[in-house]
Amino acid sequence: MSNEYKIKPEDIKDLINPMGYCYASDTITIDGLPVGYMHREKSEDEEDSGWRFYSGTETEEYVEDEHHFMMFDLNYLANCDPTIIPYLKSKKGIELERVEGTDKFREIKE
């Protein structure tokens, strides 16, 4: 796997107001897959948006390897997959999965 990011810094557009950073899987930021699952947890610090993004293709072993995840400005993820934008102001604790074949997400309720 190459460590070249999907979007070069000079190609990033301001799609959202600053909201802090997030963590995202390399399957999105390097491999270019769309977001398939996202959740918002309690922030680690003042700059942490709480958002965590996955393509949904990651295995348990993949997720357990911290080297497969990086911290990004939330706007970078919005550039990678703009379909997440309508959901970014959702409350902490929410879990969302993509409705297969669409640009929409639905809340996962336990």
Question: Where in this protein do the model-derived segments appear?
Answer:
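Negatively charged, low-complexity tracts enriched in Asp/Glu with abundant Ser/Thr
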Residues: 2-23
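Phenylalanine-focused residue identity feature
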Residues: 5, 21, 53, 69-72, ...
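Short, solvent-exposed secondary-structure boundary motifs
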Residues: 15-18, 25-31, 82-89
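Amphipathic, interaction-prone secondary-structure segments
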Residues: 19-47, 51
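Acidic, aromatic-enriched beta-alpha/helix-loop junctions
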Residues: 38-87
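Short, compact, well-ordered microdomains
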Residues: 70-110
